[in-house]
């Protein structure tokens, strides 16, 4: 295993779960990227108070480690922040005002996407079809600038048929796994949104790969390590010391 500072821990959709704390405790001193969807729990045993307290803890964790923690917004989050966003199941609509205030107070701590080396992190993923749709405005070689520009809300927030919307191609907050059979060419992606039983990945070419990471509820997460002339991607499970190598990308 490489030095801790060369390791990125990718944490899938939260939905009120505090499992992320155990992952951080297991992997101290790393970089941490949260893929979004902090509220609206699927676990009905979680109270509103627990979910909100968990979001507050995540925000505080970011404030304590500004350079080491990335908080991405998901489709369940943007609906509380932007009027233009498509609405999805608001399991916490009765405390909406409190959630809106939390996000808006610290919105500067949240991002739409992040790029590290040739790896792009977004909530749901970028399809080649969506890129072609948006290509009159986007340069693939400067894609991160485009996807983090709030002026591009219309295409970014697009919700396709697979998730109940009307857009031909979903944007990177809504893209379903079924829409990502052709992910953005020339990049490796790590995304959440589409629930999977474990870390799954789809390889198109050596440099066009997408990892699906929405399996935090199963205690599973992605580890990315850079060492020498390669980047390695591991699947990890809480409660187990050994991680499983999934893919090696040679720089």
Q: What are the residue ranges of the model-derived segments?
A:
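Beta-strand-turn-beta hairpins that frame and shape the catalytic cleft
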Residues: 1-9, 114-121, 208
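Active-site neighborhood of phospho(di)ester-bond hydrolases with catalytic His/Asp-centered motifs
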Residues: 10-12, 32-36, 70-75, 121-122, ...
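Core catalytic region of metal-dependent phosphoesterases/phosphodiesterases
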Residues: 11, 16-102
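Structured catalytic-domain cores with a bias toward divalent-metal coordination
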Residues: 11-14, 109-115
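Active-site environment of divalent metal-dependent phosphoester hydrolases
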Residues: 15-20, 40-42, 76-82, 127-129, ...
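Active-site-proximal loop/helix segment associated with metal-binding centers of metalloenzymes
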Residues: 94-97, 111, 115-185
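Conserved beta-sheet core of the metallophosphoesterase superfamily
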Residues: 175-236
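MPN/JAMM (Mov34/JAB) isopeptidase/deubiquitinase module and associated MPN-bearing subunits/adaptors
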Residues: 231-251
């Amino acid at each position: 295993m490489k030095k801790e500072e060369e390791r990125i821990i990718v944490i899938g959709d939260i939905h009120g779960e505090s499992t992320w704390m155990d992952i951080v405790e297991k992997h101290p001193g790393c970089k941490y990227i949260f893929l979004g969807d902090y509220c609206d729990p699927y676990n009905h045993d979680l109270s509103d108070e627990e979910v909100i307290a968990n979001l507050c803890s995540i925000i505080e964790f970011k404030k304590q480690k500004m350079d080491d923690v990335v908080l991405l917004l998901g489709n369940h989050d943007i609906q509380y922040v932007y009027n233009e966003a498509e609405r999805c199941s608001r399991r916490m609509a009765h405390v909406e005002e409190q959630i809106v205030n939390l996000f808006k107070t610290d919105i500067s701590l949240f991002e739409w996407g992040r790029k590290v080396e040739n790896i792009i992190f977004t909530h749901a993923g970028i399809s080649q079809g969506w890129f072609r749709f948006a290509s009159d405005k986007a340069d693939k070689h400067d894609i991160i600038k485009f996807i983090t520009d709030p002026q591009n809300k219309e295409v970014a927030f697009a919700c396709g048929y697979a998730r109940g919307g009307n857009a031909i191609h979903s944007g990177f907050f809504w893209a379903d796994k079924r829409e990502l059979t052709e992910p953005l060419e020339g990049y490796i992606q790590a995304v959440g949104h589409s629930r999977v039983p474990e870390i799954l990945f789809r390889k198109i070419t050596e440099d066009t790969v997408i990892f699906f990471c929405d399996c935090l509820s199963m205690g599973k997460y992605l580890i990315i390590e850079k060492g020498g002339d390669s980047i390695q991607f591991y699947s990890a499970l809480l409660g187990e010391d050994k991680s499983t190598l999934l893919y090696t990308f040679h720089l």
